Amino acid sequence: MKGDRSRQNMAVTKKAKLKKNDEPKKVLKTAATEKGEGSKRYSLWNFWISTLFLKLLLIPDYFSTDFDVHRNWLAITNKLPISEWYYEHTSQWTLDYPPFFAYFEWFLSQFVPKSVRDDGCLDIVEIGKFGLPTIVFQRLTVIFSEILLFVILQIYINTTKLSERSQSFVVASSIVLSPGFLIIDHIHFQYNGFLFAILIGSIVAAKNKRYILCAVLYTTAICFKHIFLYLAPCYFVFLLRAYVLNVNNFKFKSYKDFLFLIRWANLLKLATVVVGIFTICFLPFAHQMPQVLSRLFPFSRGLTHAYWAPNFWALYSFMDKILTTVMLKLPYVHTFATKFIKPPLIPQNIKEINERLAANNNGSKGLVQDVFFVILPQIPPKLTFILTIFYQVLAVLPLLFDPSFKRFVGSLTLCGLASFLFGWHVHEKAIMLVIIPFTFLVGFDRRLLVPFMLVASAGYVSLYPLLYKGQDFFIKTLYTYVWCIIYFAAFRKTTKISSSVERRIFFLDRLALTYIFSLLPIVTVLQILDEVKWRYSFLQKFEFLGLMIYSVYCSLGIISSWFALSWLYNFDELLWQ
């Protein structure tokens, strides 16, 4: 017995010695890994130089009416006094962005060379008449303003821990090479790279717990592009909980103790910078605020855009089309429906259905005006606002209890999704408001990868109708699918796998992959039909059908991503620890 005990003690001692000897090796291994990570140069400037050639080649390519929009804004801010900027309406492309963007346009107009001025760049006319000099100048302003995006994301990489730097490099490079920025900015024509750089700066500041800087950059972003207001509930709750409220040290004994719940100095600093930035932005227009607000929030434009954004209202509009067709072809379906749903919630008879079709814009004419549904109830702006706020409240509640960066980015993504899916007159380009914050989130856990793949692939493909000319089909399709292949694989390699949870959260991931792979044949068939439709009169009757397929199919992917992320965000506590 004594011999057995002594042998056991010797074995335990030997194990302890081996463990003790292994500890320095582990430390050295960790140090070596970090040294290896630190010795690598995670620079984005190689990407800027390499993509510069592609962007320069795209200068003479197709551009949308947004090009003349921004040309007109250059002219307005350059030629007119500031008091007339938001009143000028010679062109239909009136100034409808916040004042900081107007100041930005004024700044750019100061660098317009004489040859570009002579080309008509700064003429205030109903329809712009310009040539290659104006095109080159405006394209270059987009390219060089986008440098800010590279700078902000390089700061994000450099401020990340060495052990996580490869992951942050994947995140940053996927954003600067985003198909969305290539399609929207460098072909279609806008300044989203520059504008999202400011928003991303606020996200990076939040990650580094620089809360005042976060507030400054987010408020500035709103003053450049008011669509960022959709994210305000998330920023408000995050800054309130992380910077203003002193919850950790709070002990309730009497109601006076609530005074100590608030860090008053922090609240004062936060309020000062936010109010100060809004004052700088809007003070020159204080006497014309109703006019400015009417330009920024034009509710008369209708529920959906001419091309339905791939959201809930696209499915709602599609269902209205299906019901209308079915009831006209099979009148007894209408008779059956009226037994359960009474007018005015449904047309009284087939004659009324035909009258509504003849009289109203039912969403399939490509008109930018108020849309009237034939069968389904009309949707007022108030309802879209209520739905958006409801789902945003659900997104920010967990953030109120856990103001971590991971929760913040998750809440930010869901707030963007809620506004995109249920908002009023949402543009397809607003999907970038979802994809960009989701990119920062996906690296935390591999279970987030499939929802991200869904929203990224469906979101980027939904932008294809912006470039409707056949000459752009190859570039937009090839670039998007190469990006998807590279970065979906890169995220799979660099994202963490939670060892605490082995079950498959997103159990429909194979169905999701089937959906993603189906996008390519769908867009190819639609492009072929678009190219040959002029030969066949029956295809010309269904001119809007291709856009409808884009909207409906892409909305299915984006809504599925929303369901999956919402489930993980609200019910998988281990993922957020």
Swiss-Prot record:
<keyword id="KW-0808">Transferase</keyword>
<keyword id="KW-0812">Transmembrane</keyword>
<feature type="topological domain" description="Lumenal">
    <location>
        <begin position="190"/>
        <end position="219"/>
    </location>
</feature>
<feature type="topological domain" description="Lumenal">
    <location>
        <begin position="526"/>
        <end position="543"/>
    </location>
</feature>
<dbReference type="GO" id="GO:0006488">
    <property type="term" value="P:dolichol-linked oligosaccharide biosynthetic process"/>
</dbReference>
<feature type="transmembrane region" description="Helical">
    <location>
        <begin position="308"/>
        <end position="328"/>
    </location>
</feature>
<feature type="topological domain" description="Lumenal">
    <location>
        <begin position="114"/>
        <end position="139"/>
    </location>
</feature>
<keyword id="KW-0328">Glycosyltransferase</keyword>
<feature type="topological domain" description="Cytoplasmic">
    <location>
        <begin position="329"/>
        <end position="382"/>
    </location>
</feature>
<feature type="transmembrane region" description="Helical">
    <location>
        <begin position="544"/>
        <end position="564"/>
    </location>
</feature>
<feature type="topological domain" description="Cytoplasmic">
    <location>
        <begin position="441"/>
        <end position="447"/>
    </location>
</feature>
<feature type="topological domain" description="Cytoplasmic">
    <location>
        <begin position="492"/>
        <end position="504"/>
    </location>
</feature>
<feature type="transmembrane region" description="Helical">
    <location>
        <begin position="169"/>
        <end position="189"/>
    </location>
</feature>
<comment type="function">
    <text>Dolichyl pyrophosphate Glc1Man9GlcNAc2 alpha-1,3-glucosyltransferase that operates in the biosynthetic pathway of dolichol-linked oligosaccharides, the glycan precursors employed in protein asparagine (N)-glycosylation. The assembly of dolichol-linked oligosaccharides begins on the cytosolic side of the endoplasmic reticulum membrane and finishes in its lumen. The sequential addition of sugars to dolichol pyrophosphate produces dolichol-linked oligosaccharides containing fourteen sugars, including two GlcNAcs, nine mannoses and three glucoses.</text>
</comment>
<comment type="similarity">
    <text>Belongs to the ALG6/ALG8 glucosyltransferase family.</text>
</comment>
<feature type="transmembrane region" description="Helical">
    <location>
        <begin position="383"/>
        <end position="403"/>
    </location>
</feature>
<feature type="transmembrane region" description="Helical">
    <location>
        <begin position="471"/>
        <end position="491"/>
    </location>
</feature>
<feature type="transmembrane region" description="Helical">
    <location>
        <begin position="448"/>
        <end position="468"/>
    </location>
</feature>
<feature type="topological domain" description="Lumenal">
    <location>
        <begin position="1"/>
        <end position="42"/>
    </location>
</feature>
<feature type="topological domain" description="Cytoplasmic">
    <location>
        <begin position="241"/>
        <end position="266"/>
    </location>
</feature>
<keyword id="KW-0256">Endoplasmic reticulum</keyword>
<keyword id="KW-1133">Transmembrane helix</keyword>
<feature type="topological domain" description="Cytoplasmic">
    <location>
        <begin position="64"/>
        <end position="92"/>
    </location>
</feature>
<dbReference type="GO" id="GO:0005783">
    <property type="term" value="C:endoplasmic reticulum"/>
</dbReference>
<feature type="topological domain" description="Cytoplasmic">
    <location>
        <begin position="161"/>
        <end position="168"/>
    </location>
</feature>
<feature type="transmembrane region" description="Helical">
    <location>
        <begin position="43"/>
        <end position="63"/>
    </location>
</feature>
<protein>
    <recommendedName>
        <fullName>Dolichyl pyrophosphate Glc1Man9GlcNAc2 alpha-1,3-glucosyltransferase</fullName>
        <ecNumber>2.4.1.265</ecNumber>
    </recommendedName>
</protein>
<feature type="topological domain" description="Cytoplasmic">
    <location>
        <begin position="565"/>
        <end position="577"/>
    </location>
</feature>
<feature type="topological domain" description="Lumenal">
    <location>
        <begin position="288"/>
        <end position="307"/>
    </location>
</feature>
<comment type="pathway">
    <text>Protein modification; protein glycosylation.</text>
</comment>
<feature type="region of interest" description="Disordered">
    <location>
        <begin position="1"/>
        <end position="24"/>
    </location>
</feature>
<feature type="topological domain" description="Lumenal">
    <location>
        <begin position="469"/>
        <end position="470"/>
    </location>
</feature>
<dbReference type="Pfam" id="PF03155">
    <property type="entry name" value="Alg6_Alg8"/>
</dbReference>
<feature type="transmembrane region" description="Helical">
    <location>
        <begin position="220"/>
        <end position="240"/>
    </location>
</feature>
<feature type="transmembrane region" description="Helical">
    <location>
        <begin position="420"/>
        <end position="440"/>
    </location>
</feature>
<dbReference type="GO" id="GO:0006487">
    <property type="term" value="P:protein N-linked glycosylation"/>
</dbReference>
<feature type="transmembrane region" description="Helical">
    <location>
        <begin position="267"/>
        <end position="287"/>
    </location>
</feature>
<keyword id="KW-0472">Membrane</keyword>
<feature type="transmembrane region" description="Helical">
    <location>
        <begin position="140"/>
        <end position="160"/>
    </location>
</feature>
<feature type="transmembrane region" description="Helical">
    <location>
        <begin position="93"/>
        <end position="113"/>
    </location>
</feature>
<dbReference type="InterPro" id="IPR004856">
    <property type="entry name" value="Glyco_trans_ALG6/ALG8"/>
</dbReference>
<dbReference type="GO" id="GO:0005789">
    <property type="term" value="C:endoplasmic reticulum membrane"/>
</dbReference>
